[in-house]
């Protein structure tokens, strides 16, 4: 039987040597938001705590400035 190994999580921001997560970088921020608009936790994404705090702040700033929606599904 074939065994499925879970891919090791790593922090993309550490690997790319990012100094600051910008709230205007919408494409990056959307990767860390669910389809309901919630911020994905670091235990799922593998983001380090320092960058997770910056990420949450950047997402909240972008939401406040209406760059990204609070929720995607309005039914």
From Swiss-Prot:
What cellular-component terms does GO give this entry? cytosolic small ribosomal subunit
Q: Assembly state and interactors? A: Part of the 30S ribosomal subunit. Forms a tight heterodimer with protein bS6.
Keyword Nuclease among record annotations: no
The record's annotation in HAMAP family points to: Ribosomal_bS18
Tell me the GO molecular function terms. small ribosomal subunit rRNA binding; structural constituent of ribosome
Q: Which SUPFAM superfamilies match?
A: Ribosomal protein S18
What does the UniProt keyword field contain?
Answer: Ribonucleoprotein, Ribosomal protein, RNA-binding, rRNA-binding
For this chain, the family text in UniProt reads: Belongs to the bacterial ribosomal protein bS18 family.
Q: What is this protein called?
A: Small ribosomal subunit protein bS18
Q: What is the lineage of its organism?
A: Bacteria, Pseudomonadati, Pseudomonadota, Gammaproteobacteria, Moraxellales
Q: Name one Pfam family in it.
A: Ribosomal_S18
GO BP term, pick one: translation
Free-text function comment from the UniProt entry: Binds as a heterodimer with protein bS6 to the central domain of the 16S rRNA, where it helps stabilize the platform of the 30S subunit.
Q: What organism is this sequence from?
A: Acinetobacter baylyi (strain ATCC 33305 / BD413 / ADP1)
């Amino acid at each position: 039987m074939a065994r499925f190994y879970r891919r090791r999580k790593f922090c993309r921001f550490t690997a790319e040597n990012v100094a600051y997560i910008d709230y205007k970088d919408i494409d990056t921020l959307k990767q860390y938001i669910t389809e309901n608009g919630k911020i994905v936790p670091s235990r799922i994404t593998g983001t380090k705590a320092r960058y997770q705090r910056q990420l949450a702040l950047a997402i909240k700033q972008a939401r406040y400035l209406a760059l990204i929606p609070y929720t995607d599904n309005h039914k």
